[in-house]
Amino acid sequence: MRCPNCNSLDTQVKDSRPTEDSSVIRRRRVCIACNFRFTTFERVQLRELTVIKRNGRRVPFDRDKLVRSLQISLRKRPVEPERVEQMVSAIVRELESGGEADISSETIGEIVMDHLRKLDDVAYVRFASVYRNFREAKDFEAVLGELSGEEEARPALVRK
């Protein structure tokens, strides 16, 4: 592994441990040349995914882009970073195990929205407003109506 500080290839792993859900290995490393310490993460990649954009262009799937878009949707929301990481891992696993190496951006967006709907309603609406390209207030009303309908269908919690 190349040192991000001095570009030396002479680094040593000091500590390795799985994350809480065991989907990632976290490694603490030290550069032998400059003593710089850094962390790397190792994930299983089942297949190389390609995203087919709305304009037909093909680009490699970027997990970090998914993380950034979720962080924007979840900004100032009471959601722990660990939950976000678990959700991202679940989304990527779902995409990789789908059997197709080429995935449309629409499919990715729908999967993300399904996961966000379960995690945080506000983040779901924020993501939907960008993903579905909302132009008017009625677009928001429609999504809020969907969420309200789901809330009515769920049994209410009785508090004593």
Swiss-Prot record:
Keyword tags: ATP-binding, DNA-binding, Metal-binding, Nucleotide-binding, Repressor, Transcription, Transcription regulation, Zinc, Zinc-finger
Coiled-coil intervals, chain numbering: none
Entry-linked PROSITE patterns: ATP_CONE (PS51161)
unnamed zinc-finger residues: 3-34
Signal peptide residue numbers: none
Disordered: annotated span: 1-20
Molecular function GO labels: ATP binding; DNA binding; zinc ion binding
Cofactor binding summary note: Binds 1 zinc ion.
InterPro entries: ATP-cone_dom, NrdR-like_N, RNR_NrdR-like
Matches recorded under Pfam families: ATP-cone, Zn_ribbon_NrdR
Biased composition, class Polar residues, residue ranges: 1-11
Any one of the GO BP annotations: negative regulation of DNA-templated transcription
Occurrences of domain ATP-cone (ranges): 49-139
Cofactor(s) demanded: Zn(2+)
Family stated for the protein in its record: Belongs to the NrdR family.
Main function: Negatively regulates transcription of bacterial ribonucleotide reductase nrd genes and operons by binding to NrdR-boxes.
Protein's name according to its UniProt entry: Transcriptional repressor NrdR
Source organism per UniProt: Rhodopseudomonas palustris (strain HaA2)
Gene encoding the protein: nrdR
